[in-house]
């Protein structure tokens, strides 16, 4: 029987509550599909500060090193905002984990589920078509990290500058990740750039076009970033996999998230070249609702499904979780963030309903 070790970092706020439901669902699929998941829990973020004095203790990092994947909850809260920036839960835990494991590829799915169209801010006729896309964002290159960057001069002559730098190998590996993701989905990649203006985008487009030759089953199209932001509003159903540089992906992934209508539904994954991944909900720790049993666990549960798909290649089990989520939503069950006139189900009840639907 295939066995996998998972470092479970529930973190702060609603993290422990929603993580418990993800574990519940994972226990169901490992029983149904005949593989073994070993869960090892570690402190991270504010919880780690309280117990160990550091947001990312050495024991936690060691546990992650020994794992096959990291299932991450959420970190942060008002209790720790007065700490020095590098000691705060977000910057002191999540960023070092990304750096340590060389997580260069961010996957952000955005899906509008049947029955949730009214939460979509788009026109009703557009929302009625639904959409199911994933944004593939390069995480370690581009203008956020390029050199030189800085400020110089004074008075009206003060200037600030940043540099957009991409190496061909950086574009190749993120393009490969996008094409591989498309192979598991609807076999279409839309590469986002600004090749009519930027040299970095010209290299981006050339390289992605070359890479496409290795994936003849996948349809490739190129789109300028300004047009991409418009088409996301006009016809989101036309997208499958959106391939983006760091800064363009930062913008596009948030736009795609907002048109779904609920951050509580959105998972994410950050991967390295070996397929090792950190999987987490796209939303935050929501300390205002922590402990009330009303948080939506679906983003955490879908993050677990992504882990099965992208790190372990357990596509059938991942499909089963995603189908169960769709079934439960289609039957009208809602947590408080999505409930209207109906009585909302609790965090634990939603987890149980999804588990039973598998």
UniProtKB/Swiss-Prot annotation:
One of its GO terms (molecular function) is 3-isopropylmalate dehydrogenase activity. Keywords: Amino-acid biosynthesis, Branched-chain amino acid biosynthesis, Cytoplasm, Leucine biosynthesis, Magnesium, Manganese, Metal-binding, NAD, Oxidoreductase. NAD(+) binds at residues 77-90, 284-296. It is found in: Cytoplasm. Transmembrane segments: none annotated. Binds 1 Mg(2+) or Mn(2+) ion per subunit. One of its GO terms (cellular component) is cytosol. GO terms for biological process: L-leucine biosynthetic process. It catalyses: (2R,3S)-3-isopropylmalate + NAD(+) = 4-methyl-2-oxopentanoate + CO2 + NADH. Its cofactor is Mg(2+); Mn(2+). Mg(2+) binds at residues 226, 250, 254. Belongs to the isocitrate and isopropylmalate dehydrogenases family. LeuB type 1 subfamily. Catalyzes the oxidation of 3-carboxy-2-hydroxy-4-methylpentanoate (3-isopropylmalate) to 3-carboxy-4-methyl-2-oxopentanoate. The product decarboxylates to 4-methyl-2 oxopentanoate. This is 3-isopropylmalate dehydrogenase. It comes from Haemophilus influenzae (strain ATCC 51907 / DSM 11121 / KW20 / Rd).
């Amino acid at each position: 029987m295939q066995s996998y070790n998972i470092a479970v970092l529930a973190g702060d706020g609603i993290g422990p509550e929603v993580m418990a439901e993800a574990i519940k669902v994972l226990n169901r699929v490992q029983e149904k599909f005949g593989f073994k998941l070993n869960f090892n829990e570690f402190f991270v973020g504010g919880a780690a500060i309280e117990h160990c004095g550091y947001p990312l203790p050495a024991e936690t990092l060691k546990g992650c090193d020994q794992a096959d994947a990291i299932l991450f909850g959420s970190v942060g809260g008002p209790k720790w905002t007065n700490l020095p920036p590098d000691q705060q839960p977000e910057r002191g835990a999540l960023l070092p984990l990304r750096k340590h494991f060389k997580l260069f590829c961010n996957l952000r799915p955005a899906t509008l589920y049947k029955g949730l169209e009214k939460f979509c801010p788009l026109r009703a006729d557009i929302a009625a078509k639904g959409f199911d896309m994933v944004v593939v964002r390069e995480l370690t290159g581009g203008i956020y990290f390029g050199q030189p960057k800085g400020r110089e001069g004074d008075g009206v002559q003060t200037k600030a500058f940043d540099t957009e730098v991409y190496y061909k190998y950086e574009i190749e590996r993120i393009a490969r990740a996008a094409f591989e993701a498309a192979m598991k989905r609807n076999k279409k990649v839309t590469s986002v750039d600004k090749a009519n203006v930027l040299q970095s985008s010209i290299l981006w487009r050339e390289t992605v076009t070359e890479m496409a030759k290795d994936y003849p089953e996948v349809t490739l199209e190129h789109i300028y970033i300004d047009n991409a932001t418009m088409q996301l509003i006009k016809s989101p159903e036309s997208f499958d996999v959106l391939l983006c540089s760091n800064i363009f992906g930062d913008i596009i992934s948030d736009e795609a998230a907002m048109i779904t209508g609920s951050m509580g539904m959105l998972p994410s994954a950050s991967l390295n070249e070996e397929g090792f991944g950190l999987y987490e909900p796209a939303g935050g720790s929501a300390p205002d609702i922590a402990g009330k049993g009303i948080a939506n666990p679906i983003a955490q549960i879908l993050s677990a499904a992504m882990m099965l798909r992208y790190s372990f290649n357990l596509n059938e089990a991942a499909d089963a979780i995603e189908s169960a989520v769709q079934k439960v939503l289609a039957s009208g069950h809602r947590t408080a963030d999505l409930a209207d006139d109906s009585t909302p189900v609790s965090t634990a009840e939603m987890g149980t309903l999804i588990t039973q639907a598998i």
